[in-house]
């Protein structure tokens, strides 16, 4: 561990030199890249330096105990040794966590795609519940939510809704929401009072910046069409809706939320860039992890990750076996109990893999 920490400190000092280089300062991409790298490892370096200082003090204090000391002084030194050993242990554990490989996408904004799956109208209504749950969670975090594309049903649900959440650390918190969410409840239209089971799928994609994924104009086919509202009726006689197809990968994105074709194209391009980036990211991750089963969510969107049981006011996350009897509060955006537990499980798994 100490060798890795020393290498991190050496890199931090090298970055300080690079960030003072006029050639780097004049290159905005390099400046941003190195500044972010330095920011990412700064806490690790600061804690490592504190750790080295504590170990040096501990070494000196233990050496003092080898000298001839009066009883009062010996007791004081013993207390100091005990305190320093406690600090040493705390800092050591903290450094282990800081050395856990950080997902480079953690600080990014996210694009969330929620779709009604098995269950027809009830699944579409549940997709709406999930959208509102994430919107309220984002609001509590101080993040901004913006709808990119929505396909409504006549009962007020969503066949599909795609929205962006802008906020630092959004992907770190929401990436574990990938998968199939199951709901068990009595539909309002059910006269017999029978419980129905429906599902909705959630995909969480990190927003890709232009410098990270280069999409050439020649590789994108642009189709325009008239936008439509609930039930398929036309709501705009102009060809304002846009469909983008990334020819090399076959990824397709549509957007008709705005009245302006230009704005719809801008929104669609954000989603296209994120989906293409996510496709490459998933392929690279699958290759890297092909022989190692992850403990927390594989990202497989057909995987049932959570069940929302309305009659029992219960939500269960099947990946970590956590059940909470607060479904009503969770749908109001109080997701911290689940998200924090999933983050901790992920860190523990990565620490184990790193040892």
From Swiss-Prot:
<keyword id="KW-0648">Protein biosynthesis</keyword>
<comment type="similarity">
    <text>Belongs to the prokaryotic/mitochondrial release factor family.</text>
</comment>
<feature type="modified residue" description="N5-methylglutamine">
    <location>
        <position position="233"/>
    </location>
</feature>
<dbReference type="InterPro" id="IPR050057">
    <property type="entry name" value="Prokaryotic/Mito_RF"/>
</dbReference>
<dbReference type="GO" id="GO:0016149">
    <property type="term" value="F:translation release factor activity, codon specific"/>
</dbReference>
<dbReference type="InterPro" id="IPR045853">
    <property type="entry name" value="Pep_chain_release_fac_I_sf"/>
</dbReference>
<comment type="function">
    <text>Peptide chain release factor 1 directs the termination of translation in response to the peptide chain termination codons UAG and UAA.</text>
</comment>
<keyword id="KW-0488">Methylation</keyword>
<keyword id="KW-0963">Cytoplasm</keyword>
<dbReference type="InterPro" id="IPR004373">
    <property type="entry name" value="RF-1"/>
</dbReference>
<dbReference type="GO" id="GO:0005737">
    <property type="term" value="C:cytoplasm"/>
</dbReference>
<dbReference type="InterPro" id="IPR000352">
    <property type="entry name" value="Pep_chain_release_fac_I"/>
</dbReference>
<dbReference type="InterPro" id="IPR005139">
    <property type="entry name" value="PCRF"/>
</dbReference>
<dbReference type="Pfam" id="PF03462">
    <property type="entry name" value="PCRF"/>
</dbReference>
<protein>
    <recommendedName>
        <fullName>Peptide chain release factor 1</fullName>
    </recommendedName>
</protein>
<dbReference type="Pfam" id="PF00472">
    <property type="entry name" value="RF-1"/>
</dbReference>
